[in-house]
Regions:
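Conserved RecA-like ASCE ATPase "motif II neighborhood" in helicase/translocase motors
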Residues: 70-79
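Conserved interdomain linker/interface between the two RecA-like ATPase lobes of SF2 helicase motors
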Residues: 131-132, 139-182
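Walker B catalytic acidic pair
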Residues: 72, 88-90
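Walker A/P-loop NTP-binding motif
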Residues: 2-12
Length: 185
């Protein structure tokens, strides 16, 4: 779906960064990229060798058109001509670095895009509360997909007015939710 945005960015001679929440997702994404473009993107994560990392950094600093797919640390890389950042599964808590220097890679991607005058796409089937709030504040724009990627049946959703359905003093969930949870446990 967003491979078209990457393609358009490459045609213009620009660099793209695709952030993924887990290292394990890079291989699947690389295969998808290869199937679409006929070549592999640069891959960045902690398991790459120093030689591989040095080669990638030289390429990024040259400004040559390329696509880098990586885990959260890739947002810290020096791009010379970055014009597109895609943060896939933006809601995922794996984007938060809890040890060492603490940072939220999704938020850094947004800031990096602003500094680079790049487009930043936050992709998620279930956006984070922060992104929904920013959308409500008109800081972000939400684009809804008309077609699902995997054509799965969407779950039914029922909104329970907690003013009408007072929970018991021992719990904070409504009686309807509690009763349904007993059925599905």
């Amino acid at each position: 779906m967003y491979l078209k945005a990457v393609e358009s960015n490459l045609v213009r001679g620009n660099q793209s960064l695709i952030l993924l929440p887990e290292i394990a997702l890079t291989e699947e994404w690389s295969r998808r990229f290869f199937k679409y473009f006929g070549c592999r993107p640069f891959i960045w994560h902690s398991k790459q060798s120093k030689i591989q990392k040095a080669r990638i950094i030289r390429s990024l600093l040259s400004g040559e058109p390329c696509v880098l797919v990586g885990a959260r640390s890739s947002v810290l890389l020096p791009f010379k001509n970055l014009k597109l950042i895609i943060c896939d599964e933006e809601h995922d808590s794996s984007y938060k670095q809890e040890d060492g220097p603490k940072y939220q890679a999704r938020d850094m991607a947004i800031y990096k895009a602003k500094c680079s005058k790049a487009l930043c796409l936050l992709i998620s089937a279930s956006p984070s509360l922060e992104s929904l709030h920013n959308s409500n504040q008109r800081k972000f724009h939400i684009h809804h997909l008309s077609n699902q990627f995997h054509k799965t049946q969407l779950p039914s959703v029922e909104i329970v007015d907690m003013n009408q359905s007072k929970p018991s003093s021992r719990t904070w969930i409504s009686k309807q939710v509690f009763d349904l949870s007993l059925i599905h446990i």
